[in-house]
Amino acid sequence: MTTTLSRPTDGEGSVQVQQDPSMKIEEGALVIAVYGKGGIGKSTTSSNLSAAFSKLGKRVLQIGCDPKHDSTFTLTHSMVPTVIDILEEVDFHSEELRPDDFVFTGYNGVKCVESGGPPAGTGCGGYVTGQTVKLLKEHHLLEDTDVVIFDVLGDVVCGGFAAPLQHANYCLIVTANDFDSIFAMNRIVQAIQAKAKNYKVRLGGVIANRSADTDQIDKFNERTGLRTMAHFKDVDAIRRSRLKKCTIFEMDDDDDAVKAVKNEYLRLAQNMLDNVEPLEAVSLKDREIFDLLGFD
């Protein structure tokens, strides 16, 4: 006798991480989850976008959701302790913690938190993200925040690391103009489609990064219903800002390329504040992407 396995709907099965209703982030805050292929520049993009929102006068909180805990170091100019490390120090008695123990103020007042994660091969990163949001709410740290940015590791869209999508209004996908990045982006679109059935998250658009051109991204956008919200070329000043452990907004204004990058981040931030029209994008099958991308 054969057994037919059916794909569970979102929220069914042990691999899914469900949001406690009490952990919902207050209405009014703009919550953005940033995803993309590993190494594509999500942390750089997230930190510079956080800085841009702060330049527009917004109160910003950035939450790094990667065990590497390197999301916010260009904002804080240091590698800050993670929530999971700090909780371990007090034997997970969160009531013993003060906000200053796990929230660090970075460039232009941006608040920074690194959730961290369990050791490799153990635990669930989504659980850690959930505990981070819980801790922030217990200390009423989300009530006076205008913008929350979740910077999520790699392109992992399992139940755990899809957890930030349960809190977000919009997902922004960082991609380059190449096959691997766009292939990963398609998987993220699939995750958004699944989460959007039960949560408020919607696709906000694409951020083209480290790419002189966007012809392949444009092809994918046209087929799926996505749009490019910002385009950052491979500017060496961005690489140097990481080495200097600072945001692009702290780099020399005399460089026209730096000015252009700053203006593009400010434009992106303002567009996100102006109530971006959510996208109803439709993902492609793997074979369709293979046939779509490339040159004739």
From Swiss-Prot:
Quick one: where's region Disordered? 1-20
List the InterPro entries: NifH/chlL_CS, NifH/frxC, P-loop_NTPase, Protochlorophyllide_ATP-bd
Q: Which cofactor does it need?
A: [4Fe-4S] cluster
Please list the GO biological process terms of this entry: light-independent chlorophyll biosynthetic process; photosynthesis, dark reaction
- The positions annotated for binding Mg(2+) are S43
According to its UniProt record, in which pathway does this protein act?
Porphyrin-containing compound metabolism; chlorophyll biosynthesis (light-independent)
What is any Pfam family matched here?
Fer4_NifH
The protein's matches in CDD domains, at most eight in alphabetical order, are given as: Bchl-like
Q: Which UniProt keywords apply?
A: 4Fe-4S, ATP-binding, Chlorophyll biosynthesis, Iron, Iron-sulfur, Magnesium, Metal-binding, Nucleotide-binding, Oxidoreductase, Photosynthesis
Per the annotation, how and in what number is the cofactor bound? Binds 1 [4Fe-4S] cluster per dimer.
Q: Name one GO molecular function term.
A: ATP binding
The catalytic activity, as recorded, is: chlorophyllide a + oxidized 2[4Fe-4S]-[ferredoxin] + 2 ADP + 2 phosphate = protochlorophyllide a + reduced 2[4Fe-4S]-[ferredoxin] + 2 ATP + 2 H2O
Look at the named UniProt entry and state the broad enzyme category this protein falls under.
Answer: oxidoreductase
Q: Which residues bind ATP?
A: G39, I40, G41, K42, S43, T44, K68, N209, R210
Q: Does the keyword ATP-binding apply?
A: yes
Annotated binding of [4Fe-4S] cluster, by residue: C124, C158
State the EC number(s): 1.3.7.7
Q: Which domain of life is it from?
A: Bacteria
Task: Summarize subunit and interaction data from the UniProt record for this chain.
Answer: Homodimer. Protochlorophyllide reductase is composed of three subunits; ChlL, ChlN and ChlB.
Family according to the record:
Belongs to the NifH/BchL/ChlL family.
Note the NCBIfam families from the entry. Answer: DPOR_bchL
Q: What does this protein do?
A: Component of the dark-operative protochlorophyllide reductase (DPOR) that uses Mg-ATP and reduced ferredoxin to reduce ring D of protochlorophyllide (Pchlide) to form chlorophyllide a (Chlide). This reaction is light-independent. The L component serves as a unique electron donor to the NB-component of the complex, and binds Mg-ATP.
- Protein's name in the database: Light-independent protochlorophyllide reductase iron-sulfur ATP-binding protein
Q: Which organism does this record belong to?
A: Synechococcus sp. (strain CC9902)
